[in-house]
């Protein structure tokens, strides 16, 4: 399927799209390059800015996958399903040929964090553990935590399914757990999200991200939480409405600069749209085969940027 999209990408004329929502992202890149401060960070020099917000429509199945470079959407989607299952075992991603967590789960990296007790590929109590078993004592990535900790995601689902509670202002899911930060391979960057239902029917998600790698990570986070909103809307009998992205520390790594300067000169295409075809009994049963492309993902060519562990 990806080959078909690549073919479409090559054949489509490069015409200006009325995709003003992606232009928000391109403007963020430009602003950081032009006005950001140069900082020496944990893993390299960055152009840095603090505090930004972007808003994307999810109406009619739209999903904001950045088009001014080719995004590895399958990798992004599979990572989300892995989070939803509550997994922290990188081996499961490796088996799907997804390597985005390899550096952070290597023996050397875990040792650098003082996590000598974790075996290689065990990421500790990161996103999935906090979403499904918040603050449950973490043993290892093979332990069954069913019934332990707080299942934040299931709580939100239960509230959304009930017309009497779906307008609650407490539909919050946090991956930031100060009690377990030092046990994680990497503290959560996208740390807290809140869901909101408008007029009893339209579901939106707001994400606060404390640290945003604007070149690589932020496009993944936009697509991932937008897909999560679509899945929850389907699962709970609602319609996806908007994704709102709040960013704290927004940064561009110095060695991403050349690629991003190419990207900001490109004109975006329209965002694709999807349908969640099946409705499962349990949220963890959704998988990539449940996604149907209504309007395909068309993009410019990929741009190489190194991930900073």
Which residues does each PLM region occupy?
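Terminal, non-catalytic protein-protein interaction segments that mediate quaternary/complex assembly
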Residues: 5-309
């Amino acid at each position: 399927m990806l080959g078909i999209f690549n073919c479409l990408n090559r054949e489509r004329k490069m015409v200006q799209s009325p995709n003003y929502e992606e232009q928000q992202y391109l403007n963020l890149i430009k602003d950081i390059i032009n006005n950001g401060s140069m900082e020496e960070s944990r893993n390299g020099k960055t152009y840095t800015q603090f505090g930004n917000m972007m808003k994307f429509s999810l109406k009619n199945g739209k999903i904001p996958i950045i088009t001014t470079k080719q995004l590895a959407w399958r990798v992004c989607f599979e990572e989300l399903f892995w989070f939803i299952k509550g997994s922290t075992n990188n081996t499961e991603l490796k088996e799907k040929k997804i390597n985005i967590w390899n550096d952070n789960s290597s023996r050397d990296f875990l040792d650098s964090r003082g996590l000598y007790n974790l075996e290689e590929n065990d990421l500790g109590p990161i996103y999935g553990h906090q979403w499904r078993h918040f603050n449950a004592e973490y043993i290892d990535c093979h332990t069954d935590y069913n019934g332990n900790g707080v299942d934040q995601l299931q709580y939100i689902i239960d509230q959304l399914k009930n017309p009497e509670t779906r307008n609650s202002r407490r539909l919050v899911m946090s991956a930031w757990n100060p009690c377990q930060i030092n046990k994680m391979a990497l503290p959560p960057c996208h740390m807290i999200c809140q869901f909101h239902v408008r007029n009893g029917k339209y579901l939106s998600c707001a994400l606060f991200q404390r640290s945003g790698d604007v070149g690589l990570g932020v496009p993944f986070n936009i697509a991932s939480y937008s897909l999560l909103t679509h899945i929850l809307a389907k699962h709970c009998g609602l319609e996806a409405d908007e994704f709102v992205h709040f960013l704290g520390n927004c940064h561009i790594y110095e060695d991403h600069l050349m690629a991003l300067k190419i990207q900001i000169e490109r004109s975006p295409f329209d965002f694709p749209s999807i349908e969640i075809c099946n409705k499962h009994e349990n949220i963890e049963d959704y998988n990539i085969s449940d996604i149907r492309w209504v309007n395909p993902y068309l993009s410019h060519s990929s741009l190489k940027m190194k991930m900073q562990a």
